[in-house]
Amino acid sequence: MDQENDRSISRLWRTFRTVKEMVRDRGYFIAQEELDLTLEDFKVKYCDSMGRAQRKMMSFQANPTEESMTKFPDMGTLWVEFCDEPSVGVKTMKTFVIHIQEKQFQTGIFIYQNNITPSAMKLVPSIPPATIETFHEAALVVNITHHDLVPKHIRLNEEEKAELLKRYRLKESQLPRIQRADPVALYLGLKRGEVVKIIRKSETAGRYASYRICM
């Protein structure tokens, strides 16, 4: 039991680190010491005296960096919540949705352990202009953007998108697509119509860029 709990805590620590990296990579301020949190320090900070994870204590707010606010003025604040309950029903999701509304967060990220009921999932798109995203803990144990085969993706703002289309005399419909369900699109929180610049390494050209629109 203790060994299984240790493995579970280790996975949760890695998920927590990936979430912090994901939030930082979206342009929110995350201090370096938060990214460098060791497993032992994680246990001290987020586990009780019995060594059990206290997920509610892991929830946090993040604000855009100055650079991000200049590029994306409507970005707003973000709230990440780790759910204590193994299975998420309507009541828990409704509480989360109300929290996002009342505190006027622009984005709410809900991290769950096992599953969310279909009825609870129906609440997810219910509070525009705020966006709610859900992630399974297991999907974030490893940061996919750190994989050697995953190129760097950079989200463009509306001005950069318009300039791109003008430069290449393109319509939106002519751009290659990236699906919203793509793991990197989910990681960056891409919305329909947003464009990403993808930088790949080339043996002949050093680096080259391509562009995809989220659909």
Curated annotation (Swiss-Prot):
PROSITE patterns xrefs:
RNA_POL_H_23KD
> InterPro entries attached here?
Arch_Rpo5/euc_Rpb5 (IPR014381), RNA_pol_Rpb5_N (IPR005571), RNA_pol_Rpb5_N_sf (IPR036710), RNA_pol_subH/Rpb5_C (IPR000783), RNA_pol_subH/Rpb5_CS (IPR020608), RPB5-like_sf (IPR035913)
Q: Where in the cell does this protein reside?
A: Nucleus
List the GO cellular component terms. Answer: RNA polymerase I complex; RNA polymerase II, core complex; RNA polymerase III complex
Name the keywords, alphabetized: DNA-directed RNA polymerase, Nucleus, Transcription
Q: Name one GO molecular function term.
A: RNA-directed RNA polymerase activity
Q: Which GO terms describe its biological process?
A: termination of RNA polymerase I transcription; termination of RNA polymerase III transcription; transcription elongation by RNA polymerase I; transcription elongation by RNA polymerase II; transcription initiation at RNA polymerase I promoter; transcription initiation at RNA polymerase II promoter; transcription initiation at RNA polymerase III promoter; tRNA transcription by RNA polymerase III
The primary site where this protein sits is: nucleus
Q: Name one Pfam family in it.
A: RNA_pol_Rpb5_C
The similarity comment for this entry is: Belongs to the archaeal Rpo5/eukaryotic RPB5 RNA polymerase subunit family.
Complex and partners: Component of the RNA polymerase I (Pol I), RNA polymerase II (Pol II) and RNA polymerase III (Pol III) complexes consisting of at least 14, 12 and 17 subunits, respectively.
**What is this protein's function per UniProt?**
DNA-dependent RNA polymerase catalyzes the transcription of DNA into RNA using the four ribonucleoside triphosphates as substrates. Common component of RNA polymerases I, II and III which synthesize ribosomal RNA precursors, mRNA precursors and many functional non-coding RNAs, and small RNAs, such as 5S rRNA and tRNAs, respectively. Pol II is the central component of the basal RNA polymerase II transcription machinery. Pols are composed of mobile elements that move relative to each other.
Protein name per the record: DNA-directed RNA polymerases I, II, and III subunit RPABC1
Q: Which organism is it from?
A: Candida glabrata (strain ATCC 2001 / BCRC 20586 / JCM 3761 / NBRC 0622 / NRRL Y-65 / CBS 138)
Query: What would be the name of the gene that encodes this protein?
Result: RPB5
